[in-house]
Amino acid sequence: MADWSAEQYLKFEDERTRPARELLAQVPVLAPRKVADIGCGPGNSTELLVERWPQAAVIGVDTSADMLRQARERLPQQKFIEANVAHWAPPPDTDVLFANAVFQWVPDHLKHLKRLVSGLETGGALAVQMPDNLDEPSHILMREVAFEEPWRHQLSKAAESRDMLPKPGVYYDALRPLCSRLEIWHTVYNHVLDDAAAIVEWVKGTGLRPFIDPLDLHERKAYLAAYTARVAAAYPPQADGKVLLRFPRIFFVAIK
């Protein structure tokens, strides 16, 4: 997959940052020595961490060069590194691991979550939020269009870019033996957007990328036209003309 686009992602910065704020509010660590923002993106979540813990050494970690470029422009005093969390280990004395909307992209992510919790010192925290929206029309329709001609050959594997998330009980059973406390919850957002085209713009920043990146300009235009038409049918306008993008997310905070 091509690099992520920070510009596209930030078109809905307020809406994308809200889950990070709500996750952070449930982290009880008062004075961490070091904090790592895993999947920091363009630095919007990192900024929250710096504001919450100005005395801590906060680093951002991401695989995207474009996201990291934007993060460094936003927070020039902070350290950002390019790394894949599947092969990355936190620096010693890291007391908070914060991961907003990243682990859904990591294969076998439960294994890595267990590794990260196990490496925390007593009182440290792993805080995670992941979109749980593969069964929403926005994502069902991506796959539906991709499995049709003329895109089937190129996009047959795109639907495999993200696995369905396990049930909350699976996370609980895997992580609870490794920590002193585990909080886990779901939140369903209903984001108010202008129209179906705005929903498409939203998912172009993240979930739609594996479907459109393999296509050339002409193919991409045709795919997006077919997808947008189905999104418009699945998300009818409200009385004022706006549409509601239903967006479930799972959260958990593990305290060592």
Curated annotation (Swiss-Prot):
Chief site of localization: cytoplasm
Gene Ontology terms, MF aspect: trans-aconitate 2-methyltransferase activity
Report the Gene3D superfamilies cross-referenced here.
S-adenosyl-L-methionine-dependent methyltransferases (1.10.150.290), Vaccinia Virus protein VP39 (3.40.50.150)
CDD domains to which the protein is assigned, alphabetical: AdoMet_MTases
Give the UniProt record's GO annotations in the biological process aspect. Answer: methylation
* Localization terms from the record: Cytoplasm
Which EC number(s) are documented for this chain?
2.1.1.144
Keyword match Coiled coil: no
Is Isomerase there in the keyword field?
A: no
The record's keywords, sorted A to Z, are: Cytoplasm, Methyltransferase, S-adenosyl-L-methionine, Transferase
- What does the similarity note say? Belongs to the methyltransferase superfamily. Tam family.
Q: What does this protein do?
A: Catalyzes the S-adenosylmethionine monomethyl esterification of trans-aconitate.
What this protein is called in its record is Trans-aconitate 2-methyltransferase
Q: Native species of this protein?
A: Rhodopseudomonas palustris (strain BisB5)
